[in-house]
């Protein structure tokens, strides 16, 4: 049973690791696409700002600031490409394969069947290897306590019309003769009652210890499940707010660019609007990954679920 629990724990950890790497790739892919799109936008902005400078509507400082931001975005693109390569190598290691490019989906298109409005029954924690192990320890301690209690009494049964029977269930024809010949073995557990009581107390203490350990294991497991559920719920709440933030910032970025072209705003406002939009889009993508990651953590916290 312990080896089965170990295999289940390793299997769950491996599946969670593979899933985490896969969805990390999807997150990085989307962040890379956003950064490349932003890179192209900044390239056009640098060109238009330079044209404004040549027309006397912008200064060299504005062009330099725009170029610096453009180069910064290019650097971010290279960093993301490197991260993608590293995660692909990690995924190949988990799959025991030669590192390669993995065909994959798109983060925005990922759908998960979720419905935790009524919570998760605590019985589902029984799939966890550590909970199963603690449960078996408690069962063994419970049976040990009952065995110690049964030693209080001789192995003779009074069965009414069936008369006297021994531990094998055979009828004792002459109880008097049986008691006379077996008085030594019969009285031994009675006179050794103090020792039996001590054994019972030890077994009882072991049962209480196992019970406390089982309760603590359940509490720890439940805490992990609650943490995963809380993270999932938080990500869902943040998702709606981030969507609204990105939509507002997209409008602001377009407006400031148009205003600058007509000389009604400064390049600093354009820089701020564009940079804030990029950060919000990257955060939006990271939050979507956090939502998925919380479900992966929930899978782990539940011990991998049912086979």
Placement of each model-derived feature along the sequence:
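Alpha-helical heptad-repeat coiled-coil segments that mediate oligomerization/polymerization in large
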Residues: 56-59, 221, 228, 263-267
């Amino acid at each position: 049973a312990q080896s089965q629990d170990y295999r289940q724990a390793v299997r769950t950890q491996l599946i969670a690791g593979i899933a985490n790497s896969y969805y990390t790739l999807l997150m990085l892919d989307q962040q890379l696409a956003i950064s490349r799109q932003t890179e192209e936008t900044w390239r056009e902005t640098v060109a238009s700002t330079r044209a404004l400078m040549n027309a006397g509507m912008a200064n060299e400082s504005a062009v330099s600031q725009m170029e610096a931001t453009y180069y910064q975005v290019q650097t971010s693109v290279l960093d993301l490409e490197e991260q993608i390569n590293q995660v692909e190598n990690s995924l190949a290691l988990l799959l025991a394969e030669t590192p390669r490019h993995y065909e994959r989906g798109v983060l925005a298109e990922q759908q998960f069947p979720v419905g935790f409005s009524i919570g998760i029954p605590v019985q589902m924690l029984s799939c966890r290897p550590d909970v199963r192990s603690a449960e078996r320890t408690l069962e063994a301690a419970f049976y040990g306590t009952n065995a110690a209690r049964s030693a209080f009494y001789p192995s003779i049964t009074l069965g009414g019309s069936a008369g006297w029977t021994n531990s094998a269930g055979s009828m004792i024809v002459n109880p008097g003769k049986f008691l006379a010949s077996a008085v030594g073995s019969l009285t031994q557990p009675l006179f050794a009652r103090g020792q039996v009581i001590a054994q019972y107390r030890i077994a009882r203490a072991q049962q209480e210890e196992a019970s406390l350990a089982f309760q603590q294991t359940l509490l720890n497991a439940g805490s992990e499940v609650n943490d995963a559920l809380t993270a999932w719920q938080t990500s869902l709440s943040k998702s709606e707010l981030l969507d609204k933030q990105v939509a507002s910032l997209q409008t602001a970025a377009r407006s400031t660019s148009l205003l600058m072209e007509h000389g009604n705003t400064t390049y600093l406002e354009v820089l701020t609007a564009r940079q804030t939009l990029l950060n919000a889009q990257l955060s939006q993508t990271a939050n979507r990954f956090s939502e998925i990651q919380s479900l992966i953590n929930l899978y782990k916290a539940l011990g991998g679920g049912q086979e």
